[in-house]
Amino acid sequence: MGSSQSTPLTNGIKAALNGDEKLYAFPSKIAYQLEDVRPYNLTIPVKPAAVTYPKTASQVAAIVKVAADAGLKVQPRCGGHSYANYCIGGVDGAVVIDLRHLQHFQMDRSTWKAKVGGGTLLGDLTKRMHDAGNRAMAHGTCPQVGLGGHATIGGLGPSSRLWGAALDHVEEVEVVLADSRIVRASATENPDIFWAVKGAGASFGIVTEFVVRTEPEPGECVHYSYSFTVGSYATLAATFKTWQKFVSDPELTRKFASEVIISEAGMIVSGTFFGSEAEFNKLEMNKKFPGYKDHHTLVFRDWLGLVAHWGETVALRLAGGLAAPLVAKSLTFNGADLIPDKAIDSLFSYLERVEKGTLVWFIIFDLAGGAVNDVPQEATAYAHRDALFYLQSYAVGIGKVKSSTRKFLTGVNTTIRNGMPGGQDFGAYPGYVDPTLVNGPLEYWRTNLPRLQQIKSAVDPRDIFHNPQSVPLAGTPVPTSAPKIAMVRVRVRKVLAKLCF
């Protein structure tokens, strides 16, 4: 895929890939950035030392050894949707291992567990599971996102309240470690590695195969949406208060998925109900959200059709997932730390007056809870088991992201934080990476970070699998105040779980 000067790195990569020029690229290649690097966030320029496209786990292992021998960092890429370009290293000089060729799929019809290649995209996974017996698993809505990153960092989607996060479906992995060993990991084999991969995978290895538990596809489902125009931000604030009260009801069925999307055009309350239209109508959504401009409900009896509809909705919102200059922030909220009415009023007042610097911005509140909360926080590296809903805000610049746009999104988080009673450990969802966080690892992994650091030091002591916010080695100073607060929240969650679910 391009000529290069002869170095130990280039020679080693060529040898690892049997000299197949289609399976590697170096910076000397014409159109290297456009065709091979392909950064998702155009505001963060990154030039990897090499981009590779192995076809087997053995080739992945060989590339890891070559990179480690050269003293370089390694990061895997599957879908390539990292907000901070961590899948290409996050900074210059990493070796990228693109997993696009790892596409194998096999369903065991006796157990309904599937073996899935680490390079599989969510859209392909949905189709393959359907064709193998009308099976499904929880995952996000963007079909171009890769399972390799999604199921090793969290993996939330509309069906997560029913089935859990994507990583909760994972029962075994084949993973390439920093010393280039290929190992199997599960709850009984290499359990520490398995624990770490389920929430912080990119810091520990490259998953070349997943074994996942599947569920029968749901039957009839209802997709709903209620649109509200900007007319008055005070009106939108009242609608959001209604939504928060509704979704925080301990008796809310797990069949109900929902999100609030705030944008330049107004606000949308939308989601999916995993049940019949008759069941959905009993929720009386029309009465709960009066004053809407438009209201639509679509009944799906075809799982592929519903998942495709999710993807189309996301495509409209994200411009098809194309690379763009963007900035993003996130927060998490649990049932014990709901946003007070005054803070909601402050947020919408802020949105009304602030200079945003772009017309393409979104503030999204995604309902979580349900089955995701059933799993104890210490059971996997994924640490946001007490989350009721997530805030994700992002904006796209035209040509570049303006400073006013960055200030706008920072102000969203600041306004909410300042309006909270105090003492909250919000944390940040590791799938919504934010390179501006002062202590990203603590925000992402919370009380699980110390154990992750110990495992990291044991299996990757040279920190080969690294990006700017990956799990640091043991001994790296970590603040202790936030984790203590987090443990209080976990105890509260466990009490609430007995009452709520």
Language-model regions: role of each:
Residues 1-501:
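Soluble FAD-dependent oxygen oxidases
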